[in-house]
């Protein structure tokens, strides 16, 4: 364990380097004032002989080591220790614990003798440094995993800023079809080559007699000059030996130049004259890239894009590299034992670490985060091997579904009902859901971090239709107990017939149940005997042989959704595991709590009124002034100080699941429990769901863009995915305003139904036919227009090798698949699609959603989903692109592999097996978030809300530092924080910091969530806003263009939130004096707005108002008068003649009509004045922050939102606000700020709702 911990710590230490070097100057000054950061010098054995390093007193010595290893001047050192005052410093102590170490102290770097492991690590590191390491082939992370496109887009932006050429939106087609090139990496120039190869020599491993002499490894290096050197890795360093390919003589070779060095890097620089120059060129090329785009992943699994460059393209070309297959040996030694870890022991000892001080908590959470990341990766790798049949089962005689496996100290089983545990709940379907819910339950318990309660490391992996559970092995779980003893110590034993209780489990389960709002309740075994349990009978407690208390099977921490199961007139749901979500229970608890507090306050007020009346007479002469203020503050305190200890809400998770109470009292209690659960279910249906629909209807929150963002939004609100159908019905009833939502909901149901159908076929298909199966099913769903009767493309010679394989997928036709999808949609979501639903599919978006749900990576080319899109006179199997005949020239990947082109007689289909390049596993993990980092962030937010700006910013920077230390830089949580922080800096007018953080948010979001995720679009839109606020408008437009291109791929045109973006673009174009282009974007925005909100809505009037001004600036005075009249008429009919919006429009209309001749000059003057003012405070320019999905957008400037009266200003001044003060105008969100900065929007909610 000690060794593993050391390794963990060592590999984690890379993040602080980023911290100390990568932060903004404000943070550094902040820390220096706190005395946290100081500089020390490091004395080196070779050139440059001394370097300066910035360190923090809280850092560990190994963090300093890591900083040294990553500095260009000290790359070559990997095997060394540090000394101070002649004494060796322990790597695992903090710098503050090193006696006498202070600013400007000198520590000495001393080179150590190598061990075999150190030598292997050195070779790996040097290969990476000199660019000799090819891409590792990886069965977990797919092609182009962790891709970021930011660099190529910012290059385009930089080119636009420096040249005087037209801006990036000048010829942009807003309604154009999507280009798949948007999400593909650009082909890059090859990096400078420093050496031809560095590999292990065929003379490995070292013979015994030479191990005694300190030989560790034998290497072979071929320099750029073509010379081959055989090199011995020795305890003292590296030297050229006398071996040849045929003769073994591993002793030093006399050399004209220096033939030995402690570091391999130094040795190669002696041997190859061109090495130093080419190595410098390589570093220069790498430095052009943003560090974050190449930084290796440590605490997260990188995102694998669904669309990748074809195998034939230069981006994914497969290069020869002899060492690629040797890397496993270099990483983990001869017997691979170095990577075997006792996962369970590591998890539990980490959980037992002290958590008394902040330092303790940082260390503990950092270790936890790294451990979970390592485990999730190892478990996912093993699960892939199990799914492929590469691991031998422990019980080979059992049925496939009942087989269990152990690989890399992780226990695997299938998420299927192999032994009949869930027979009464729905069999395999129930088992599949149960393991998914179990991970969610374990994640919740890990987050609570209850002292003395332990969970096994758990991961669920979906791969090739199979669901596989990987768990760390709990000591004692396989132990056969004595006769009469139960296998389980607490909870139901193998079903609910036998129930075990154990006094030791009561205190820890009590804490758990209190936190998860679970009620202590009675259950009865098969003999009718009562047992009082703290949790659900399904949740089990096991006393491990290590003496720890483990909680298992957490799939029932919330009650069943009783109303769903009892719904009249519905098809039977596939299983009985439909439970409520934890978020809903929490939301219901808050709802009941607020009712309790209100009732309590009312009761107090009533009591106070009586008390005050009696006191008034006796104290009439007391100081009346003070009394008034005191009474107010007391009343406020009274409201704040409502004692909630009297309030409790806990739900019984076992109601309606077959328990039979025995006595009348028990029956009465049970009925009460059931009533509470039914009220919770009703709360979901009557309050939560209608509120979500209303919020999206009113435009109060950001709108989902694809299946992923929709699911996240529902889950955040506590709504289960099974309610997609109900939501679609509610959304339909709201009419045209929510067409976009209905479309997304229906598309999500179809994609999920297809996923279930595809999985049922894939589960039994032999590996070589997987691509054929998927391609055929996709053709039946998406390619029926191209070929109404597609045939599965199966290699006949391969088929003969698998006589018993399942080829039932061949029989699927478009008609049978549609019927199957309708059946799934009906039973799973209780929704009936429109009769001709398959004719209105958005093919590209559905293909993307399905690919993400199944883990597909498709080759990029122009897919044809209609006959009209098929290319003329091209081998038909090649297909062509989604609605994009026009854009053919753009795709680099219409690549015809020889195999495809060779059989032109095949009928055309949309997708061929060769298009499915790879399938990646989908991992559901139980990693907890860092509570420490979240506490700091919350404290910072509260301080800012209380106007303590200095303290708030310090706390938020502290939270940023904790996030980066605990999660590493590349992690979705860190991306989220960068995003929030950039917004905060934007609001406090610190533009440079906002841009810097927004840029980081873009890159980390791209690499962890995907280059075309909804979060990535939002990150790009915010970055464009902040760039514009900093005066880089051309750059901002490049980012907007990229975001719009992404939007076309993931949603299509006319997304409700795109109104905000189009208005932002229009305002930016006005800023560049591109009046005619600006007008186009306002017109596009108006089109979407009218389609969503109707011609007579206030939102439409607001855009008409802005458009009229844009027309005036574009010297179209006649058009301007017409649009302003339309705006005036809408304001008049909706808000009445006295409303300030109506009056303002009227004044403008008069002016525009009177001055029709001189209008152009008038508008130009105003524009010039507006620009002068903008330069003073660009932030109120009228661009608007894009809200995140499901959240309302923050008001962009704290101060202005508090000032509601702008009435007295002149038209000239108001132009600034009107022309873009609320550029989103489609949304009535951000009411506060809109009312302040744009009087036209006042009162819009009631009229537009």
UniProtKB/Swiss-Prot annotation:
Keywords: Cytoplasm, Repeat, TPR repeat. Residues 613-638 have a biased composition (Basic and acidic residues). Residues 1178-1191 have a biased composition (Polar residues). Residues 321-565 form the Clu domain. PROSITE patterns: CLU, TPR. TPR repeats lie at residues 975-1008, 1017-1050, 1059-1092. GO terms for biological process: intracellular distribution of mitochondria; mitochondrion organization. Residues 1-34, 610-638, 874-907, 1178-1249 are annotated as: Disordered. One of its GO terms (cellular component) is cytoplasm. The keyword Repeat applies. InterPro entries: CLU-central (IPR033646), CLU_dom (IPR025697), CLU_N (IPR028275), CLU_prot (IPR027523), GSKIP_dom_sf (IPR023231), TPR-like_helical_dom_sf (IPR011990), TPR_rpt (IPR019734). Pfam families: CLU, CLU_N, eIF3_p135, TPR_10, TPR_12. GO terms for molecular function: mRNA binding. Transmembrane segments: none annotated. Residues 1192-1205 have a biased composition (Low complexity). Its main location: cytoplasm. May associate with the eukaryotic translation initiation factor 3 (eIF-3) complex. Belongs to the CLU family. PANTHER family: CLUSTERED MITOCHONDRIA PROTEIN HOMOLOG, EUKARYOTIC TRANSLATION INITIATION FACTOR 3 SUBUNIT EIF-3. mRNA-binding protein involved in proper cytoplasmic distribution of mitochondria. This is Clustered mitochondria protein homolog. It comes from Aspergillus oryzae (strain ATCC 42149 / RIB 40) (Yellow koji mold). The lineage of its organism: Eukaryota, Fungi, Dikarya, Ascomycota, Pezizomycotina. The gene is clu1.
């Amino acid at each position: 364990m000690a060794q593993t911990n050391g390794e963990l710590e060592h590999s984690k230490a890379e993040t602080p380097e980023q911290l100390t070097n990568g932060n903004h100057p404000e943070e550094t000054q902040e820390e220096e004032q706190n005395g946290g950061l100081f500089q020390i010098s490091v004395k080196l054995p070779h050139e440059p002989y001394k370097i300066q390093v910035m360190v923090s007193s809280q850092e560990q010595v190994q963090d300093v080591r890591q900083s040294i290893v990553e500095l260009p001047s000290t790359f070559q050192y990997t095997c060394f220790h540090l000394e101070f005052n002649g004494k060796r410093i322990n790597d695992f102590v903090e710098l503050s614990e090193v006696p006498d170490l202070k600013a400007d102290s000198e520590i000495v770097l001393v080179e150590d003798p190598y061990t075999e492991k150190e030598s292997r690590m050195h070779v790996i590191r040097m290969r990476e440094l000199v660019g000799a390491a090819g891409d590792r082939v990886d069965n977990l992370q797919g092609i182009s995993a962790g891709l970021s496109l930011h660099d190529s887009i910012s290059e385009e932006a930089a080119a636009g800023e420096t040249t005087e050429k037209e801006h990036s939106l000048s010829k942009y087609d807003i309604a154009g079809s999507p280009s798949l090139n948007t999400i593909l990496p650009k082909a890059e120039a090859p990096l400078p080559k420093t050496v031809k190869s560095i590999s292990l020599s065929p003379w490995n491993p070292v013979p015994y007699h030479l191990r005694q002499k300190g030989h560790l490894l034998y290497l072979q290096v071929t320099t750029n000059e073509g010379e081959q050197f055989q090199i011995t890795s020795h305890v003292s360093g590296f030297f050229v030996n006398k071996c040849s390919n045929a003769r073994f003589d591993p002793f030093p070779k006399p050399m004209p130049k220096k033939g030995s060095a402690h570091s391999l890097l130094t040795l190669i620089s002696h041997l190859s004259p061109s090495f130093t120059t080419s190595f410098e060129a390589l570093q220069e090329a790498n430095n052009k890239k943003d560090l974050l785009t190449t930084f290796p992943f440590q605490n997260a699994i990188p995102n694998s894009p669904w669309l990748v460059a074809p195998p034939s393209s230069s981006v994914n070309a497969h290069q020869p590299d002899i060492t690629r297959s040797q890397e496993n040996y270099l990483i983990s030694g001869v017997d691979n034992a170095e990577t075997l870890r006792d996962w369970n022991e590591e998890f539990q000892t980490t959980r037992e670490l002290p958590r008394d001080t902040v330092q303790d908590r940082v260390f503990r959470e950092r270790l936890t985060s790294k451990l979970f990341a390592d485990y999730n990766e190892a478990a996912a790798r093993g699960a892939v091997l199990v799914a492929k049949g590469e691991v031998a089962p422990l019980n080979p005689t059992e049925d496939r579904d009942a087989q269990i496996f152990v690989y890399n100290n992780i226990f695997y089983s299938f998420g299927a009902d192999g032994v009949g545990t869930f027979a009464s709940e729905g069999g395999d379907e129930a088992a599949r859901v149960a393991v998914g819910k179990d991970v969610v339950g374990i994640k919740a318990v890990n987050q609570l971090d209850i002292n003395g309660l332990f969970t096994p490391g758990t991961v669920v992996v979906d791969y090739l239709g199979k669901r596989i559970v990987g768990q760390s092995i709990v000591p004692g779980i396989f132990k056969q107990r004595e006769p009469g003893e139960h296998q389980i110590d607490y909870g139901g034993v193998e079903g609910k017939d036998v129930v075990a209780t154990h006094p030791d489990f009561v205190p820890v389960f009590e804490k758990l149940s209190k936190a998860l709002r679970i009620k202590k309740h009675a259950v009865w075994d098969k003999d009718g005997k009562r047992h009082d349990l703290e949790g659900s009978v399904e949740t089990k407690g096991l006393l491990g042989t290590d003496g720890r208390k483990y909680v298992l099977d957490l799939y029932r921490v919330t009650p069943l959704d009783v109303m769903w199961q009892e719904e009249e007139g519905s098809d039977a749901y596939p299983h009985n595991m439909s439970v409520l979500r934890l978020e809903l229970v929490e939301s219901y608890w808050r709802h009941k709590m607020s009712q309790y507090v209100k009732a309590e306050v009312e009761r107090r007020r009533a009591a106070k009124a009586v008390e005050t009346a009696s006191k008034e007479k006796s104290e009439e002469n007391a100081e009346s002034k003070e009394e008034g203020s005191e009474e107010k503050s007391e009343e406020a305190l009274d409201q704040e100080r409502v004692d909630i200890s009297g309030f409790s809400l806990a739900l019984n998770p076992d109601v309606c699941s077959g328990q039979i109470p025995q006595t009348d009292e028990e029956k009465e209690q049970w009925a009460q429990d059931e009533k509470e659960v039914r009220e919770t279910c009703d709360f979901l249906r009557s309050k939560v769901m209608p509120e979500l629909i209303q919020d999206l209807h009113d435009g109060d929150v950001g709108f989902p863009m694809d299946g992923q963002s929709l699911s996240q939004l529902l889950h955040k609100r506590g709504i289960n995915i099974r309610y997609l159908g109900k939501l679609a019905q509610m959304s339909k009833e709201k009419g045209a305003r929510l067409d976009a939502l209905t479309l997304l909901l229906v598309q999500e149901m179809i994609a999920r139904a297809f996923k279930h159908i595809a999985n049922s076929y894939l589960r039994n298909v032999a590996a070589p036919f997987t691509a054929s199966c998927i391609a055929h099913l996709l053709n039946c769903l998406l390619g029926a227009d191209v070929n109404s009767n597609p045939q599965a493309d199966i290699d006949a010679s391969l088929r003969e090798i698998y006589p018993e394989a399942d080829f039932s997928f061949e029989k699927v036709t478009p008609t049978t698949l549609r019927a199957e999808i309708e059946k799934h949609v009906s039973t799973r979501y209780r929704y009936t699609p429109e009769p001709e639903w398959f004719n209105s599919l958005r093919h590209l978006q559905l293909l993307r959603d399905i690919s993400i749900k199944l883990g597909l990576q498709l080759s990029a080319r122009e897919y044809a989903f209609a006959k009209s899109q098929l290319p003329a006179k091209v081998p038909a199997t090649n297909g062509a692109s989604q609605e994009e005949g026009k854009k053919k020239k753009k795709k680099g990947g219409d690549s015809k592999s020889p195999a495809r082109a060779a059989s032109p007689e095949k009928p055309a289909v949309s997708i061929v097996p060769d298009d499915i390049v790879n399938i990646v596993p989908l991992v559901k993990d139980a990693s907890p978030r860092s509570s420490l980092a979240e506490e700091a962030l919350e404290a910072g937010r509260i301080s800012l809300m209380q106007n303590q700006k200095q303290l708030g910013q310090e706390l938020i920077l502290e939270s940023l530092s904790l996030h980066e230390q605990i999660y590493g830089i590349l992690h979705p949580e860190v991306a989220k924080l960068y995003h929030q922080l950039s917004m905060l800096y934007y609001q406090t007018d610190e533009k440079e910091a906002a841009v810097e953080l927004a840029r980081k948010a873009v890159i980390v979001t791209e690499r962890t969530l995907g280059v075309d995720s909804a979060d990535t679009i939002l990150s790009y839109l915010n970055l464009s806003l902040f760039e514009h606020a900093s005066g880089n408008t051309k750059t901002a437009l490049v980012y907007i263009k990229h975001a719009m291109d992404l939007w076309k791929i993931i949603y299509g045109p006319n997304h409700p939130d795109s109104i905000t973006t189009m208005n932002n673009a229009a305002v930016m174009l006005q800023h560049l004096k591109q009046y005619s282009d600006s007008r186009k974007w306002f017109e596009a925005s108006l089109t979407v707005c009218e389609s969503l909100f109707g011609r007579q809505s206030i939102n439409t009037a607001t855009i008409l108002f802005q458009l009229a001004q844009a027309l005036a600036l574009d010297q179209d005075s006649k058009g301007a008068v017409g649009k302003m009249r339309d705006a005036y008429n809408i304001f008049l009919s909706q808000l009445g003649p006295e409303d300030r919006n109506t009056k303002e429009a009227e004044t403008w209309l008069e002016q525009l009509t009177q001055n029709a001749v001189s209008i152009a000059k008038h508008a130009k003057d105003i524009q010039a004045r507006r620009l002068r003012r903008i330069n003073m405070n660009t932030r109120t320019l009228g661009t608007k922050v894009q809200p995140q999905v499901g959240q309302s957008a923050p008001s962009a400037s704290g101060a202005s939102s508090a000032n509601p009266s702008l009435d007295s200003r002149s038209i000239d001044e108001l132009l600034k606000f009107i022309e873009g003060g609320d550029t989103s105008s489609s949304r009535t969100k951000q009411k506060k700020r809109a009312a302040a900065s744009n009087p036209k929007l006042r009162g819009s909610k009631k009229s537009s709702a």
